[in-house]
Amino acid sequence: LGLGSSPVSLFELTRAYAIFASSGKLVVPKYIRSVHDRDNELLLSSVVLRNNLETQVQDSSETQTNVKKADGDQILEESEAFLASHLIQGVVSHPRGTGRRAKKLKRPIGGKTGTTNEQGDAWFVGYSPNLVTGVWVGFDSKIGLGRGETGGRAALPIWLEYMESALQNHPVLEFPVPEGIFFA
């Protein structure tokens, strides 16, 4: 399933990528809404969402059941989360990757660009080992953003500016390599 091929909210995407960044653990997401007045005084910030944290998981008999999961619960094997994250980091680290601008942060970053049909929406969801952020650019109505307005061009610069500020006083962290993962 490619980003932009079916309706998925920014909330859902960011929450999913947080599982990779946290070595397979469920993370209770926050919408970060910041409202500043004309003097740049912060009027509103972080709101924690705690409603409807049910997740579909498969039990040993391969049937689906609703099981309540809490913040920090291991919902994906560490090795699986690491391998997925390692692949997603390629979007940033590869010289022609659509997220290559994020290399500017000079730290390990995973991320994925996304553009819906006819440039109606542009996304970038990216993460370091300790922070996951998603950016969506688009209109509430079905108006296109314009030719060439992709996730890498429209959303990634916003994400990058935010992450530069958010991570500037934090140490550079590596994604932890779980037991059983070896590099040749």
Identify the meaning behind each predicted range.
Residues P7-A184:
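A penicillin-recognizing enzyme superfamily signal
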